Amino acid sequence: RARDLVAAMTLEEKIGQMSQANGGAEGLREMVRDGRLGSVLNEVNVDELNELQRIAVEESRLGIPLLVGRDVIHGFKTIFPIPLGQAASWDPELIEQAASVAAREAAASGINWTFAPMIDITRDPRWGRIAESPGEDPHLCSVLGAAMVRGFQGERLSDTGSIAACAKHFAGYGAVEGGLDYNTANIPENELRNVYLRPFKAALDAGVSTFMSSFSDLNGVPAAGNQFLIQQVLREEWGFQGFVVSDWDAIRELTVHGFTEDDREAAGAAANVGIDMEMASTLYRDHLPDLVAEGRVGESTLDEMVYRILRLKLRLGLFERPYTDPGHLPRPLNAEHLQLARDAALRSCVLLKNDDGILPLSR
């Protein structure tokens, strides 16, 4: 069915499926109605999301439902310890259960895709996003990241309460120089493969649906334009069949990194390397029609990207069940969820023993 839909699309509709807009974007409903949008993020009002899905399904030409994304990192309404804290529990089963609770609560608000797990190896405490990761150890990060994927996605993506997971940020984001966000990361290939890529391979083996490219550059090449990462490692070596989304404005930032001359070149570079969906910015909508007309980006390349996006929508069961009925899911913040969050907090506590007076404490 996904192939049939791709064959029926205009070029503009294909680019629309590759575009994601913020929930408060101007003209959002018109974009959905015109088939110029495949996904929204950061909208959590279930009535608004059901209306957007209604417009997509009933008023757009091809009736393709929307992916609805959100950062569901350590709980949704019921809040669990930060992933760094959860890692201190050393308990994959607990972490899988926490992710499952978060998925069910998010699904009750109309969300069907989380931008998690964040599985960057983090070894520099100066970096501001260290709290989102399970930490510094590649084995622990791999095991716990895979547990989160299983918790979010459940036994089947089409099950009520399951949402698609996204492994981020691919790759090396936690190793940025000086702990400065968006900075360069210089990582030898041996260390890259044995440390920083291991959690991502574990997430892939656990069945993660999507990957998110990093803001940062790796050894001088930004992730959103990095042939080695996206094509060689992820697609060719690992055989990933899902789709890749950019991080927020990361395609536009190819020019900020000095990798491309302008927005037009950035759009072509990201599309040709295999960034299937653009988050927030509009470079694909603004420039891909001309780039395809000029032969700088092949329409067959876009066909494969759109196919991967549609395949996930089909696996999620969105064509059969585009709307959300919160009554079919457990009530957020219920007693069972709150008890699990309390248990997770207690099991994440770490007791420090001041043996031999190593810590400079008087008592």
Question: Where are the predicted features?
Answer:
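Glycoside hydrolase catalytic-domain context in secreted enzymes
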Residues: R1-R363
